[in-house]
């Protein structure tokens, strides 16, 4: 006789198995989308690659758009793990801001995503295509700019950056330099782009830093050592 406890255990096992399958699907989807674009994702392609039935994939994602949105969110989780969390131990203010910049460049440099920055690629693919996928990518890009802006404000409150600096402007400049490095590396294979970006960001931070703040930024030698360690 099947007891309630056994039914519950069987249900939990099935759910766990289903979640493992979903995560395996998303891992493959992120890898494909990072290099070939979100439009390169199809239920049929993933089913073949993972040796699953199409109906099995439809059980997890009812449409291509659902799959794309889930893939974007999976990439966001990876980004948080690889870029945001490593900065938690940095001191508030300029050390944290510089760490965000350095780790972001390192995440592209290390090839966390096969196609460089996942969100730079997704933004280029969907920026002229209104809809839920574009909206989600835009929302995540805004989160990143807000994170940089918050770090700038923290540095100003700690009296490490000049208070006449516009946080939104500085965040925009940093992001532009990072995106430029990603573009140069992906399109031209220019590994020096990361050094140039780090030099430019560090110079911009030094230019806006107070006397206290300037002592918290790495020297050129330390910065280059950091960049080499991430290759």
Question: Which residues does each predicted region cover?
Answer:
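Hydrophobic alpha-helical segments that form the core
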Residues: 115, 120, 147, 163-184, ...
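Amphipathic C-terminal alpha-helical segment
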Residues: 107-110, 154, 174-192, 204-213
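Amphipathic alpha-helical packing segments from all-alpha helical-bundle domains
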Residues: 80, 95-98, 102, 131-157, ...
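Amphipathic alpha-helical segments used for helix-helix packing
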Residues: 96, 111-132
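Basic, helix-initiating cap at the start of DNA-binding domains
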Residues: 1-36, 40-49, 66-69
């Amino acid at each position: 006789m099947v007891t309630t406890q056994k039914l519950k255990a069987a249900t939990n096992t099935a759910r766990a198995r289903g979640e493992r399958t979903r995560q395996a699907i998303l891992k493959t989807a992120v890898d494909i989308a990072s290099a070939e674009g979100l439009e390169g994702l199809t239920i049929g392609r993933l089913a073949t690659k993972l040796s699953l039935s199409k109906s099995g994939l439809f059980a997890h994602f009812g449409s291509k758009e659902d799959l794309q949105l889930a893939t974007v969110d999976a990439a966001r989780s990876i980004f948080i793990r690889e870029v945001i969390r490593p900065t938690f131990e940095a001191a508030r203010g300029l050390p944290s801001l510089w760490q965000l910049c350095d780790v972001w460049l390192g995440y592209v440099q290390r090839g966390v995503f096969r196609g460089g920055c996942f969100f730079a690629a997704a933004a280029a693919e969907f920026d002229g295509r209104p809809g839920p996928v574009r909206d989600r990518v835009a929302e995540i890009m805004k989160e990143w700019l807000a994170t940089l802006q918050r770090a700038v404000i923290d540095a100003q409150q700690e009296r490490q950056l000049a208070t006449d600096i516009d946080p939104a402007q500085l965040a925009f400049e940093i992001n532009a330099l990072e995106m430029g490095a990603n573009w140069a590396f992906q399109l031209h294979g220019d590994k020096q782009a990361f050094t140039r970006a780090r030099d430019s960001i560090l110079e911009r931070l030094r230019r806006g830093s107070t006397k206290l703040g300037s002592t918290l930024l790495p020297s050129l030698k330390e910065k280059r050592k950091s960049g080499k360690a991430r290759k």
